[in-house]
């Protein structure tokens, strides 16, 4: 047990109360049983994840879908993290990006702190973690899936789309950027966001950078080749930046200006880097993903993050690979020591929150917020907001679910 065992009992109770409030707000879009499981786990946790003395501030990290976006904040896993001039924003390779590049549905890693209410946090770093960016080699509108870098990308009714009216319109040869968690070591992805960057042409469109994130296998040091997911890669001339010696089973990110050649021929990449940027030790982490490499305990991995759920609340629910789970607990020497594991129910709609000025106003059924098409014709307007108050320039906060490449608003509020 850490130094909190020497603190007064009243302080410990206050800390547990604060953590409980934090847990209660982690998953507002999830089923009640899931939120309750996380809440109970943190209520019972007596060690780890200790708030800073006397502040109610909980050091934390969240990995998941960008579900809320405003001029000064992002929301991930139900916590609204404020951004400031001190917040570092970067892409998967650690290159600086701007807040204007953030989009709903992106897969984010946020490291920062959360206050005792559990509703608000402060982001120290925000990293965008796309799964892949490249040319579609197969598309199946019936199953809502596409193939990229030989791996399957599965879309759903909650996948945020941009640049295409619907999933069925994605075609072989399109250049897309995909976000979402990987389902297995072969690099199959459950898409939280798909953006079409270029439309298919007789010749594959030129694009600045093709990128792939995946787990390594079949490493051949002599030939300097390996598989990333299902894609054969040559790193002979690549800039290599790794946290440890290259080996099988690592999560890496590769990129090159040129598109990959035909299957079976190694793709000569220009960059090869470790993907996992989380610190080895962290007081509290909330993440979602798909169970892989399941062993008794249960012990498993989420992408390449080892999870020890042997003492976690809800551990008996983890019975097979490819289950989507939510996990909370501290990171200890690179392993997530789960306080709680809970299944994420398939098909539960994701409620997104978007704030900003109205643009391109036509009617309550057709306007934009931060470039996203909005249909508020069936929304509840929170007074003093009304449908009549919708004009270009008025600032709104809307909540809604995905409909095509926009949002169907369920609630509309006016902002100052």
Give each language-model segment a name.
Residues 1-45:
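Sec-dependent bacterial lipoprotein signal peptides
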């Amino acid at each position: 047990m850490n130094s909190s065992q020497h603190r007064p009992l009243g302080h410990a109770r206050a800390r547990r109360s604060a953590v409980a409030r934090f847990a209660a707000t982690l998953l507002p879009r999830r089923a009640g049983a899931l939120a309750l499981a996380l809440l109970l786990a943190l209520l019972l946790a007596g060690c780890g994840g200790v708030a800073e003395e006397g502040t109610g501030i909980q050091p934390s990290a969240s990995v998941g879908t960008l579900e809320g976006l405003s001029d000064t904040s992002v929301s991930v896993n139900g916590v609204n993290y404020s951004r400031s001039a001190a917040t570092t924003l970067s892409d998967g390779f650690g290159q600086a990006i701007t807040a204007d590049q953030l989009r709903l549905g992106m897969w984010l890693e946020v490291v920062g702190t959360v206050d005792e209410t559990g509703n608000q946090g402060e982001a120290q770093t925000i990293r965008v973690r796309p799964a892949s960016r490249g040319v579609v080699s197969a598309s199946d509108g019936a199953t809502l899936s596409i193939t990229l870098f030989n791996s399957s990308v599965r879309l759903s009714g909650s996948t945020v789309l941009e640049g295409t009216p619907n999933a069925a319109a994605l075609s072989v040869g399109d250049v897309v950027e995909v976000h979402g968690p990987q389902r297995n070591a072969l690099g199959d992805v459950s898409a939280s966001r798909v953006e079409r960057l270029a439309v298919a042409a007789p010749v594959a469109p030129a694009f600045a950078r093709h990128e792939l994130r995946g787990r390594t296998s079949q490493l051949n040091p002599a030939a300097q080749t390996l598989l990333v997911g299902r894609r054969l890669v040559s790193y002979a001339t690549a800039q290599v930046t790794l946290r440890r010696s290259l080996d099988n089973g690592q999560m890496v990110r590769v990129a090159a200006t040129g598109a990959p050649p035909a299957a079976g021929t190694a793709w000569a990449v220009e960059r090869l880097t470790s993907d996992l940027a989380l610190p080895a030790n962290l007081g509290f982490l909330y993440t979602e993903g798909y169970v892989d490499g399941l062993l008794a305990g249960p012990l498993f991995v989420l992408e390449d993050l080892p999870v020890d759920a042997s003492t976690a609340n809800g551990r008996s629910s983890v019975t097979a690979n490819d289950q989507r789970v939510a996990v909370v607990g501290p990171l200890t020497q690179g392993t997530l020591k789960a306080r709680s594991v809970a299944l994420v129910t398939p098909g539960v709609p994701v409620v997104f929150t978007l704030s900003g000025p109205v643009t391109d106003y036509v009617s309550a059924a057709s306007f934009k917020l931060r470039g996203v098409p909005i249909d508020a014709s069936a929304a509840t307007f929170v007074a003093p907001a009304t449908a009549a108050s919708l004009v270009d320039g008025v600032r709104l906060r809307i909540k809604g679910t995905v409909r095509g490449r926009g949002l169907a608003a369920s609630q509309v509020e006016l902002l100052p």
